[in-house]
Amino acid sequence: MNRLNSILLAGICLLGPVGLSAQDATIRIHDAGTGVTIPAEIYGQFSEHLGRCIYGGLWVGEDSDVPNVNGYRKDVFDALKALKVPVMRWPGGCFADDYHWMDGIGPQEKRAYISNTNWGGTLEDNSFGTHEFLNLCEMLDIEPYISGNVGSGSVEEMAKWVEYMTSDAKSTMADLRRANGRQEPWKVKYFGIGNEAWGCGGNMTPEYYSDLYRRYATYLRDYSGNRLYKIASGASDYDYNWTRVLMKNIGRKGMKGISLHYYTVINWRDKGAATKFSDKEYYNILSKSIEIEDVLKKHIDIMDELDPQGNVDLLLDEWGTWYNVEPGTNPGHLYQQNTMRDAIVAALNFDIFHKYTRRLKMANIAQVVNVLQAMILTNEREMVLTPTYHVFEMYNVHQDAEYLAADCLTPKTACDRKVDVPQVDVTASRKDGMMNISLVNTDLKKPMKVLVAFDSPKAVSEVLSARVLTSGDARDYNDFGSADKVAPVAFKAYKLTKAGLEVTLPPCSVVALSAK
């Protein structure tokens, strides 16, 4: 094991002379640094033609009475701009392997319309297609991540899509793009060759998909200086054999990344309520969510064994909580509320993701608007930002920052699952001379007194900003008419001492500190 892995993954807290004493938890941040950068893409988003994610969420059309920017909802557009979204995946999800891109180009009133059989049988009029997605990404400075159709599409269809988007040559596809109003090609880096090939993307074996991937990848060309980063449809959860087969059978042969999907679901038959849950269910969900650390380790171990040079990246391009839909909504639309519990889940996941960015290069939460663990919820002309949105915003200081390893000595809360829940968690980074420290208190009732110590005695001399996200109850959420029930506010329960930074974390809270 190399030195970096020893720092990142050590199970023993080497806290020197600092003990718990008057503190409930003690943290030591190794401020000398790791030399590892946290990719901004860890904070990626996912948008699918599912429920009201696209229509009514991102897109209302230019003729809508909802305020819009070229057809994009202005309130959602502005919220995403403030969030500094680095990358967004589209058009799915399961929808991707039913999506035929030529249905979504040309005059909107002449586009094909279909029934979205994957998600509730909703009419799909294709008014949001390639141009609308890529133009949105361009306007918001988001890197697009296209998911191609392997399940029901042909090699030719996928190859022509890449040419349509990225070629500046004199060709039928490039001329078709120009005829549809886009003269210059777009830059498209990330391209997924299929989605969930083991399930809704074709119910394939890993051996069969590996061969199919290599065939499709062969014909996805690099045009006009654009270089595709090709991504294989990877495993779900604990299917380590899928990763092993793809790494052996594809390896570096046209594969730059391999995906992984992991949802925080305990029982797929009854996923539980988003807002009405017991204390026991709260801790069980947190436990299930942080099991992702062991899942990441095991997939990465396989990749390290078969790709010791680290040429293939791991991309967690679907993750987040998944509950029963809100009562009275279409079961196929996956609309759920979003509480302070989800904010804690998001923070704990980021704390884990940061440890594994030697191999983990992207994560895309499901989904950006109105679906699953959404950033934003809309209802006709109204919009609310969820607690999860606020965690993404509070944590975006870690994008492209140097990861600082930290040891945490904390009590844990036992639950019905195999992984106990740490009462305190931490992640830290440094960028532009600033040290950014994010702290989590998972305990529902107890404020946690925490000492944050540093290897260097003069690592921190001043706290420049401090905010906290919390509420009176983990079940609290933002809703239409009470949009700011859970929102960040200034935080003052800290002080600098000779021993370090002493912080008192409120129950069920996320705290962000920036210091120098």
Positions of PLM-derived features:
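Bacterial Sec-dependent N-terminal signal peptides
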Residues: M1-D24
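Active-site His/acidic residue clusters
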Residues: Y263-Y283, T329
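Histidine-centered catalytic micro-motifs
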Residues: L260
